[in-house]
């Protein structure tokens, strides 16, 4: 539902009287920036603005640290003026080691979705390996540690658990599928990831019910180190 973004764009368009940079940091479908620009152009024929995609990459529980010490700063615009201004704005973070990437607006929008879809894929992969480890009587943590020691893979998001969840991964994996569908592209892998994740949740639910002998009434269930 992009009604709030488009509504805010209409409010902005009615009040622009000098050059402004309109920055979108929210996770939005690719081409949202294009639509925002169209709305603004209806009231501003002289184009007193630049629409920029500047996605945030903050983890839950680590938002302040991730903002102060980001891995990268992504600026989505092909215009020189906002690029120069934003590069100066983010220079304190870049001086601390953050990578600065200036790319197209659509690419910046897609980078956010593609990143979250990849992390969801990584979680789903180790969960499937965990299923295999149970059959082989192997400790999945040993396997994930061994894999993570490879610099090409890394150990983050490689811990087996119930399933991925939260406010981002389920929404973003489905959203990137929707974008692919709109542009007639088939993301077979992401479809499989979503299905596997759903199966993982069902599998663990069945195990819990079995352990409790189908007696769930008045039972308290706690997940430790869960990525739900």
Question: Where are the model-predicted features located?
Answer:
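Structural/interface elements that position substrates and couple domains in central-metabolism enzymes
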Residues: 1-228
